[in-house]
Structure formats: C-alpha cells, structure tokens
Amino acid sequence: GIITDFALNDACSAGTGSFLEELCNRFSDYFNLKNLNNTALAAEYGIILGQHCSVFISDVIEKAIFSGCTKESLAVGLFDSVIVNYLNRVKKNRTIGKKIFCQGMPFSMEALACSVARQTGCEIIIPNNPGTIGALGASLLARRSLINDKSKYLNIDLVFNVDYLAKDNFLCKSNIGCSKPGIR
C-alpha cells in the first residue's frame, strides 16, 4: 500500500514499548514485562486507567493496587490505556478502515492487539515480526529511491560510521501539564 496520512502523538513522545517498560519497571513487584502479555490474557476483566502519561498513570495504578485490583485486570488496563491514548491523541477524528495493520515490537504481545480489536471493532493484522516492519519499509523506500535515480549512490561508509551529533534536553509540553524533563 501507499501511505496517505501520518500523525504523531502531540502530547507525549514516549512510545508504546517504553511506556509499558517504564511502568513494569516502576511496579516490578507487581508486573514483569516478559509476562505482561500472559498476565493480561489471563484476566477476567480489565479496569480503566485512562490515557495519562506514565508519570500520572502511576498514581492511578497505585490507587488501583491499594483498592485490591488484580494484576491481571491492571495489565489489561495498561494495554487499553495505550490504545485509548492512540485513538484520542493520534487518530483523533480520522476515519479508519475495517482492517488495522499493527507494527512495532509491542505488537508481539497479543494482548495489545486484542485491545485494539476490542476498542475499534476492526480486524487486526499483525505481521510475524512486527518489530522489524518499520525498518523493512524504510529500506524498501531507500532501495526504490536509489533504483529510480541512478545519480544517487549509497556510501556504505556513512551507514556504518554514524556519530550522534547532538543530544538535548527537553520538557514535556503535554496539555495536562506534565512538564517532566527528558532526553532526545
């Protein structure tokens, strides 16, 4: 297919994987990233955690743990939170088709795909190696560009000898007032 639209989360720069990993690390007595998928799939129900960043959702999780919520229902809530955030902050008012193709390493966890299906009612397609699809797409686009324009060439030394030119600090500028520091 051909990309016809693109959008990023305008409130938070954390990706799904880093969001889940950070929360599992913060609540390591309760969650384990390696088992988070199976924990969520074993749940009888999920709870609503909202669409907060990991800083604010931690408070919600602490209150839920204190009130006796099971780790299984909280795991479902984590996955659902990711998708609610996506639907409200990235998809926004855009229409989606009947099938959703999901890529990125977090989609190697079936529970995340289940959350997408549950919240959208769409058929979900997950490739065998969801974490490599973005790199594959980028390489195919680069190949097409090089094939179509013979004046371009790929200097392999530039590929293997990459230096990071800059690293800067930033403040989160989410609408809910996160103002937490980060590094990019």
Model-inferred region functions:
Residues 3-10, 97-98, 119-127, 170-173:
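Short beta-alpha connecting loops at secondary-structure transitions
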Residues 57-88:
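Adenine-nucleotide phosphate-binding core of ATP-dependent small-molecule kinases
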Residues 7-15, 77-79, 101-107, 125-135:
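Active-site nucleophile and cofactor-binding loops and adjacent substrate-binding regions
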Residues 90-119, 129-134:
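Glycine-rich phosphate-binding loops at beta-strand->alpha-helix junctions
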Residues 4-41, 45, 53, 58, ...:
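Glycine-rich phosphate-binding loop plus the immediately following alpha-helix
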Residues 1, 52-59, 106-121:
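Acidic-glycine-rich active-site phosphate/pyrophosphate-binding loop
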Residues 1-9, 14-18, 113-115, 124-125, ...:
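Oxyanion-binding/catalytic loops of NTP- or PPi-dependent enzymes
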Residues 144-184:
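Acidic, glycine/GT-rich loop-and beta-edge segments that sit at the periphery of enzyme/chaperone cores
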